[in-house]
């Protein structure tokens, strides 16, 4: 039933009754060869404590004092992380530590990071040059069976209804097990050169230049279609549509691979920055800063159905010949019409298909030293996130009805910008035993970026879009109290009020509406810790440390698809997830079908409920060594860190269980 409705009633259109097929499932007593619905098997993957992680690595640093004015520091970190399993549980299974998987999940992550810093003086100038180089490789194999519950073409990939149009009773839906395999390599090189004045004058100047180049190359292989129906896809489906910018040999790939995504994403940034501070009086200082930047977002490569490089070049060259876009796998006339009416933006691309943006952002500040112990400040600053090119920009929605009529994947998301206003204080009080840092702020976010994944209606690949505008109001504070000579208490808290103030019309009824809270933002969060020191015999010092951390309720994601997830979960597992939902709309327009009860599916988002985590430790130090026993998550609380809905049934990412351990360190120098 789930496969049929998510596929636009593909089975019913062939005269097949999905409910009758479900009744003839393998688990209902039919053999695997005669069952109308063949269930996936995962008994070979069942085990306790299946999510293993093994870390190994090394770090070293070398510092050299060249002379009294110059010194250099070089550091290198090498690390490998190998994991098996997943770190999210299925809420439909009893307890909070079990996951349902039909494919082994494996991940290997290896990186080397080298950084360098040169400090020096040139007359009245302090000079800092710093840089870094990262080389990283990630190999991933993950269960992709969840696509069956949310992919528009699920019925086509696993059911035989197209082969039995004259005999509906012979139709079968075969084992839907799927996987996704990705090999990713990434490099990043950064340089920054900064000068600061040290003259005894009322003004101070800092200026510099920054360069950043990062490249990510990935080859992703999707096993989606049933190999019993599609016996050899190497010659028909999975060959790449282009060869420029790819990281593989172009195929053919394994015969069970349905689609391949082979792309190279390069981002180059150069920036020039400066800040001028001026002491208006002995107690009042004003600052002004500016940063000019230029970013090139370069996307190259191909998928099994799209030549990404050629498509972006055509957009950048302003091609308006429908035949060109027809040859690139698009509906040519529709694309040209969208470009001409402005609904498909391409103006930021150059003739090579490179997305280039540049701008200048500013900041202003005013500091007032009320006395030797108290500083008040007010700041205004601007920020941004650069635009992102989409590999399938221009594609029409796979489901061209309802809220998705005339929708096209944007060629790129535009820059989202931040205007931030803040006031605050930093001060020592009560003769220095109480220190308070507090900030109140108001932020305006324009053209807020969000990632979208909607295989039921648009595309089975993630893309970025702009959801609308938002406002954030908040207060942050941290407090340190020297309660006694031996007891130090630290506390911090954050209060947030977030609101979506406008929304992209294409997302109305899909994303949360105007006035809604932003996701992942707790109204209140805070922590408090206490550390008590005591003397021991022989010059040793002991300590006891305890802390509590509270995080309030947060909403999961921008899309209000929780009720749709619950409806699918009940049909698949026979029970709901038990997760809380905030009701936010009479209709979720991302579901183009009624619920199992025949009613319209409402809009809502999952609530990631509040939690408290406690940690304790006791330790001892003596000269160069330190030993500590600790208990993290002392109450063994299973917290909801994130609720993932991309598998069309919710999965809950949780924290580590109670962990007891011993640490030992020795400083030798």
PLM features: residue spans?
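C-terminal beta-barrel architecture of Gram-negative outer-membrane proteins
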Residues: 521-621, 635
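Structural signature of Gram-negative outer-membrane beta-barrels, strongest in the C-terminal barrel
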Residues: 63-67, 195-198, 208-212, 263-444
């Amino acid at each position: 039933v789930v496969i049929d409705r998510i596929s636009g009633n593909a089975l019913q259109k062939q005269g097949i009754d999905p409910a009758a097929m479900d009744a003839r499932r393998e688990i209902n007593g039919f053999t695997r060869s005669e069952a109308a619905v063949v269930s996936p098997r995962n008994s070979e993957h069942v085990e306790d404590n299946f999510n293993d992680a093994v870390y190994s690595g090394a770090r070293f640093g070398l510092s050299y004092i060249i002379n009294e004015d110059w010194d250099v520091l070089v550091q290198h970190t090498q690390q490998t992380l190998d994991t098996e399993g997943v770190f999210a549980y299925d809420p439909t299974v009893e307890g909070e530590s079990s996951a349902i998987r039909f494919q082994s999940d494996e991940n290997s992550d290896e990186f080397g990071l080298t950084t360098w810093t040169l400090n020096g003086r040139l007359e009245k100038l302090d000079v800092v040059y710093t840089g870094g180089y990262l080389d990283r490789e990630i190999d991933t194999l993950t269960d992709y069976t969840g696509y069956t519950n949310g992919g528009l073409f699920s019925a086509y990939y696993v059911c035989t209804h197209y082969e039995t149009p004259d005999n509906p009773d012979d139709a079968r839906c075969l084992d839907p097990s799927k996987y996704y395999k990705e090999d990713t390599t990434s490099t990043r090189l950064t340089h920054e050169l900064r000068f600061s004045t040290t003259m005894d004058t009322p003004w101070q100047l800092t200026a510099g230049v920054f360069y950043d180049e990062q490249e990510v190359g990935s080859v992703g292989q999707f096993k989606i279609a049933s190999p019993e129906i599609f016996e050899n896809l190497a010659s028909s489906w999975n060959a790449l549509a282009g060869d420029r910018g790819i990281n593989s040999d172009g195929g053919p790939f394994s015969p069970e691979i349905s689609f391949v995504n082979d792309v190279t994403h390069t981002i180059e940034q150069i920036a020039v920055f400066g800040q001028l501070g001026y002491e208006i009086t002995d107690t009042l200082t004003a600052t002004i800063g500016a940063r000019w930047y230029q970013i090139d977002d370069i996307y190259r490569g191909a998928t099994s159905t799209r030549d990404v490089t050629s498509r972006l070049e055509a957009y950048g060259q302003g091609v308006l010949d429908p035949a060109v876009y027809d040859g690139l796998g698009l509906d040519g006339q529709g694309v040209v019409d969208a470009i001409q009416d402005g609904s498909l933006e391409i103006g930021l691309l150059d003739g090579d298909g490179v997305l280039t943006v540049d701008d200048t952002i500013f900041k202003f500040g005013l500091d007032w030293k009320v006395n030797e112990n108290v500083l008040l400040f007010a700041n205004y600053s601007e920020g941004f996130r650069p635009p992102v090119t989409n590999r399938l920009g221009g594609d029409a929605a796979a489901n061209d009805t309802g809220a998705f009529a005339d929708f096209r994947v944007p060629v790129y998301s535009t820059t989202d910008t931040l205007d931030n206003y803040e006031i605050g204080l930093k001060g020592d009080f009560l003769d220095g035993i109480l220190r308070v840092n507090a900030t109140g702020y108001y932020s305006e976010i324009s053209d807020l970026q969000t990632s979208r994944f909607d295989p039921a209606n648009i595309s089975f690949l993630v893309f970025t879009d702009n959801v609308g505008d938002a406002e954030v109001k908040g207060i942050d504070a941290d407090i340190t109290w020297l309660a006694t000579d031996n007891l130090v208490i630290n506390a911090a808290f954050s209060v947030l009020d977030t609101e979506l103030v406008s929304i992209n019309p294409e997302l109305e009824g899909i994303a949360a509406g105007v006035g809604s809270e932003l996701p992942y933002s707790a109204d209140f969060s805070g922590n408090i810790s206490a550390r008590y020191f005591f003397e021991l015999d022989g010059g040793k010092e002991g300590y006891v440390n305890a802390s509590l951390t509270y995080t309030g309720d947060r909403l999961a994601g921008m899309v209000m698809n929780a009720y749709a997830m619950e409806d699918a979960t009940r049909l698949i597992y026979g029970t709901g997830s038990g997760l809380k939902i905030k009701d936010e709309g009479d209709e979720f327009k991302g579901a183009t079908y009624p619920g199992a009860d025949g009613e319209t599916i409402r809009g809502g988002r999952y609530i990631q409920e509040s939690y408290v985590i406690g940690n304790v430790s006791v330790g001892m130090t003596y000269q160069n060594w330190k030993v500590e026993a600790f208990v993290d998550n002392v109450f063994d609380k299973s917290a909801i860190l994130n609720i993932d809905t991309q598998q069309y049934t919710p999965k809950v990412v949780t924290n580590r269980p109670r962990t007891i351990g011993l640490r030992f360190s020795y400083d030798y120098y």
